[in-house]
UniProtKB/Swiss-Prot annotation:
Its EC number is 2.7.7.41. It is a peripheral membrane protein. This is Phosphatidate cytidylyltransferase, mitochondrial. The gene is Tamm41. It is found in: Mitochondrion inner membrane. GO terms for molecular function: phosphatidate cytidylyltransferase activity. It comes from Mus musculus (Mouse). The keyword Membrane applies. Pathway: Phospholipid metabolism; CDP-diacylglycerol biosynthesis; CDP-diacylglycerol from sn-glycerol 3-phosphate: step 3/3. It is an enzyme of class 2 (transferase). Belongs to the TAM41 family. It holds the Pfam family Tam41_Mmp37. One of its GO terms (biological process) is cardiolipin biosynthetic process. GO terms for cellular component: mitochondrial inner membrane; mitochondrion. Its cofactor is Mg(2+).
Amino acid sequence: MALQALHSSGVGLRRILAHFPEDLSLAFAYGSAVYRQAGPSAHQENPMLDLVFTVDDPVAWHAMNLKKNWSHYSFLKLLGPRIISSIQNNYGAGVYFNPLIRCDGKLIKYGVISTGTLIEDLLNWNNLYIAGRLQKPVKIVSMNENMALRAALDKNLRSAVTTACLMLPESFSEEDLFIEIAGLSYSGDFRMVIGEEKSKVLNIVKPNVGHFRELYESILQKDPQVVYKMHQGQLEIDKSPEGQFTQLMTLPRTLQQQINHIMDPPGRNRDVEETLLQVAQDPDCGDVVRLAISSIVRPSSIRQSTKGLFTAGMKKSVIYSSRKLNKMWKGWMSKAS
């Protein structure tokens, strides 16, 4: 599986993991503390380490974590593990974050998501939230033998390639592809307007082209729709209506439904396949796909950020937001100078 290319045996990450309950189907680290980024993040001292823990039973996991790490939680800890798990699963993007935690000498933020919710997001892009994180290079710290999860991780990467190719011209570079892929989960994200440095996607991709290549190389080589000139770093994609229809038909279900919603006239109620056939012949096919992605990401990012006010608590939310705004301000100043 392509994701295994970035499997990490980092001792430091495993030491952090030892502070938490062991029942994890997947644990991964991401962000500027793991992979170098350009822009303001490049000059950060001791950047916060971002982690995601995937668990089969959120109620049981939070119950154990409350015993081990009571101080990590906001006032919601007083409501117990069932309420915490209900908030995790039923609001926002299905993930519960505890930010600004001091652990093993590092400042960390960790999110908890159920295995079932993650698999659904990877396959269908219901929220394109944690699925979006996993379209970029990550460090896998722990992963069990859940074959459904492994298959979903691989499908998410293949869907990212197909979606990005639909928004690109017939010929493009590896870097063009990776920029489109990295930008999928930021498309429509309101945090790109408030709190995130605008060139974030470029800052992620530019220093990490090799890591993106490692993640996607085998998928690009096997994709029958793609001509991958690996040594030249160039690619070609079939832009015929037939080729685009084939690509559209393999997109995640929620993305297909959003395309149908955008294109379907009021009262018509066409089925999805009929709509995709029309879009495949449309010169603006890529723009329609981009708009559909935004319609998934925007509400998801707003709901998740609103939930963060409660899961993090007001004090941590203010501190965390100020760190984000400070990073954005530094990005503006570096461009102006």
